[in-house]
Amino acid sequence: MTVTLPKGVFDIFPYLADAKQLWRHTSLWHSVEKAIHTVCMLYGFCEIRTPIFEKSEVFLHVGEESDVVKKEVYSFLDRKGRSMTLRPEGTAAVVRSFLEHGASHRSDNKFYYILPMFRYERQQAGRYRQHHQFGVEAIGVRHPLRDAEVLALLWDFYSRVGLQHMQIQLNFLGGSETRFRYDKVLRAYLKESMGELSALSQQRFSTNVLRILDSKEPEDQEIIRQAPPILDYVSDEDLKYFNEILDALRVLEIPYAINPRLVRGLDYYSDLVFEATTTFQEVSYALGGGGRYDGLISAFGGASLPACGFGVGLERAIQTLLAQKRIEPQFPHKLRLIPMEPDADQFCLEWSQHLRRLGIPTEVDWSHKKVKGALKAASTEQVSFVCLIGERELISQQLVIKNMSLRKEFFGTKEEVEQRLLYEIQNTPL
């Protein structure tokens, strides 16, 4: 019996020819992850890695009425009967780690992560039961320019990887007083259309009415579109804060739109919420989002600290890059040594190790295929440079290097070809 993957998960694999599966190519993930590390370093964020599973109560702080907690988590009992949950989102785990390591004494804390998340959800385009998320969490500072800086980091990531037709959509939910006032207004409005709402929205009416604005059910859309905007109910102080963020985005030339119906799917968000959207082939969809969560850290038993962050689903981002033809697999340059007879094996073993220590990626074809077959395999496997080594090369100590992409050759002693290889690898485009 052939063993296959369970539904909703996938391999990231280095050998993929099927165009529909190309988004799973290892080199694409390396490229995007490299951009993440670079842009986060430029903004002064430090990488954090939390465990794949946590005690289940960690994720209850996401909100007991959120879809993540109610129906999307993978939970299990360990051998001592304790409930554990595979990480469904990053923020709660980062806050737990932040508090457990006593970092709250620092005035400013900036973290980023690239981690797998696990949600048992209905499969849809760009979403999987194991998916990968790039996220940032900035803890300790409440300032509109900090929020703008977080948005700038998100925008710079999208720009660096080459995504096009991007826009930031924003809304401002205000604090608890604003949401209390708006809750009454929204309930009064929705009561008039209660019978027309979807079953899910009717359920949310009694648990978290604000989440109805996040509904994707078709029958809810016109009702949501005509709902009173929460921005009409925020305080003057909140509105000033929001406008300072917008002013900063204009200065930074980051395109944005105010979306008065935007709320986020996790219950801990307050004040600023945002989504990054793209439009491709006349279809608009989100590639990431986040906001402020000033009450979450105190909910964990810590001090009342301000915080802002976002998450980006990498599967959908990479699929969009491919659809927009902004990325393609890259094969790093490497040299393949091909010993043509057993007497060349020892030479290849020793020289390959020396080349690696010089910084030249090198592998040896130990299969002892015939020359034609070995060269065909090297071409098929995207090898950049090839060196055939037989009796003549061992005696003369003159080596020929074939550039497989340019179909050119250069030759010389070991020392001469080593210098030429270093130059070629550094200066030949991938």
Swiss-Prot record:
Pfam families: HGTP_anticodon, tRNA-synt_His
Keyword presence, Ligase: yes
Chief localisation class: cytoplasm
Signal peptide: none
Entry-linked InterPro entries: aa-tRNA-synth_II (IPR006195), aa-tRNA-synth_II/BPL/LPL (IPR045864), Anticodon-bd (IPR004154), Anticodon-bd_dom_sf (IPR036621), His-tRNA-ligase (IPR015807), HisRS-like_core (IPR041715), HisRS/HisZ (IPR004516)
GO terms for cellular component: cytoplasm
Superkingdom classification of source: Bacteria
KW Cytoplasm (keyword) present: yes
Ranges in coiled-coil conformation: none
Keywords from the named record: Aminoacyl-tRNA synthetase, ATP-binding, Cytoplasm, Ligase, Nucleotide-binding, Protein biosynthesis
SUPFAM superfamilies (UniProt xref): Class II aaRS ABD-related, Class II aaRS and biotin synthetases
GO MF annotations, alphabetized: ATP binding; histidine-tRNA ligase activity
Catalysed transformations (reactions): tRNA(His) + L-histidine + ATP = L-histidyl-tRNA(His) + AMP + diphosphate + H(+)
Compartments in which it is found: Cytoplasm
HAMAP family attached to this UniProt entry: His_tRNA_synth (MF_00127)
Family annotation (PANTHER family): HISTIDINE--TRNA LIGASE, MITOCHONDRIAL-RELATED, HISTIDYL-TRNA SYNTHETASE
Assembly with partners or alone: Homodimer.
Protein name: Histidine--tRNA ligase
